[in-house]
């Protein structure tokens, strides 16, 4: 598992997205047996000079962190993908670059996703926070819960809000970023920024010259300069899936793209699996709420996308959260990962049964999948009504939305 897993993040903005909406999506490709949980954290005021303990290191905390909902591998602090109360969504991709990623423990790319969500009120503000933390603390450490070898990667990010998106790609502390205001964009496990960069590390080009990767005379092409020699720069399967859509892109379109195994967007291989997925819809009309759909389970083609809306009193969903092992967690003790505890949450365990039934391809499996899709459809239609309503949703009715969807899903699995 030395290469970065084939993972995809997408955004569609008007005019390609329907009805003045921004649609965001990601499949998280991770080791097959890894469990992801969906966790909500409310906004919190912190004491002066307090610290926040990330996956491997502690850093200075800020006075206030925003409310966030994230999907994350259950052993780490950060997030593969998520959203905050201000309508900011961030996804992370592991990248192989010309310069090997540091194995020394620092911030993981996934830590930076969560830090960006907790501290940023716009996509651009989150980007500025991430590159500042990158400069201060660096990135490095094992991306997998693996005691036998260190799998370290550089990181790319897709940062999205109601108005725009940013692609941020990093190599060590160096970075480049591009602003996107219309159309579609996909990022995967290859550097994608070329000659159009709206912002960059002030020493990016000097560093490239010092390494002998750029003469200073040719036009500076970020991906060409920083990609490995054997990297195929234009092989993002997700890019084709998104660009070939002829009609306006909706939440359902994005879900269909994430479920597509034939294209490679939904990975299901010997080593890797799409262990969780997200689709978010961000209305440019600020009187409408942002809606975030999480699976919380592996393989989106056999999972239900369940909606979440930020309100002041969100009901927590323990059934989608993994057991907490505290300071005894093998991920927190050094040497790390000497044991591998059972991190499966209740939803994951129930879904294991459902996947086995569906994979058997018997009548029961076909009936179950049909029921799951019908359940999902009801949720999507209810959210469409909320988006089309001139009135904001009643917080009392949507505070337990994700909880109720998980509860209903599990009842179908019993």
Swiss-Prot record:
Pfam families: Peptidase_C69. One of its GO terms (biological process) is exocytosis. One of its GO terms (molecular function) is cysteine-type exopeptidase activity. Keywords: Cytoplasm, Exocytosis. 'Secern' is an archaic English term meaning 'secrete'. Belongs to the peptidase C69 family. Secernin subfamily. This is Secernin-1. The gene is Scrn1.
